[in-house]
C-alpha cells in the first residue's frame, strides 16, 4: 500500500473508513519498550535478579526432614545392644536370595580347564 498512487491511496482510505497510510509506521504497537523496569518479585528463594539458577530457585531443595524435638520412645545408641535384651548378640550373616553357591573343583585329569 505504500507504493500505491495518491488516487488509489485515497480510494482505499475512503473504502476502509480510516487512514491506512498513518498506520504503517506504528504497525507493531504491542512491542515492549527497550528499557524495562526491574521486576518486583516477592521475597523468597527466587527474589534475586542475578545468580539465580534453576536448581536454587526450586523450593523443594530448601525443605528438610522434620527434626524430632522430643519422643516418648527411647532411641538406641548405635553400636550398643539394648539393656533389656537377654539374648546374646550373635554375628548375623548377610541375607542372600538363594543358598550359597558351591565352589567348583577343577578336575585333576585336565588341569587347564
From Swiss-Prot:
Accessory subunit of the mitochondrial membrane respiratory chain NADH dehydrogenase (Complex I), that is believed not to be involved in catalysis. Complex I functions in the transfer of electrons from NADH to the respiratory chain. The immediate electron acceptor for the enzyme is believed to be ubiquinone. This is NADH dehydrogenase [ubiquinone] 1 alpha subcomplex subunit 7. The keyword Methyltransferase does not apply. It comes from Gorilla gorilla gorilla. The modification Phosphothreonine is found at residue 96. Complex I is composed of 45 different subunits. It is found in: Mitochondrion inner membrane. GO terms for cellular component: mitochondrial inner membrane; respiratory chain complex I. It is a peripheral membrane protein. GO terms for biological process: mitochondrial electron transport, NADH to ubiquinone. It comes from the Eukaryota. Keywords: Acetylation, Electron transport, Membrane, Mitochondrion, Mitochondrion inner membrane, Phosphoprotein, Respiratory chain, Transport.
Amino acid at each position: 500500500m505504500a507504493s500505491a498512487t495518491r488516487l488509489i491511496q485515497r480510494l482505499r482510505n475512503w473504502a476502509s473508513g480510516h487512514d491506512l497510510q498513518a498506520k504503517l509506521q506504528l504497525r507493531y504497537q504491542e512491542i515492549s519498550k527497550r528499557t524495562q523496569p526491574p521486576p518486583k518479585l516477592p521475597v523468597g528463594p527466587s527474589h534475586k535478579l542475578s545468580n539465580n539458577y534453576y536448581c536454587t530457585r526450586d523450593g523443594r531443595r530448601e525443605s528438610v526432614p522434620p527434626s524430632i524435638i522430643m519422643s516418648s520412645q527411647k532411641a538406641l545408641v548405635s553400636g550398643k545392644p539394648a539393656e533389656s535384651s537377654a539374648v546374646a548378640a550373635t554375628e548375623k550373616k548377610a541375607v542372600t536370595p538363594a543358598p550359597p553357591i558351591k565352589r567348583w573343583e577343577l578336575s585333576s585329569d585336565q588341569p587347564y580347564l
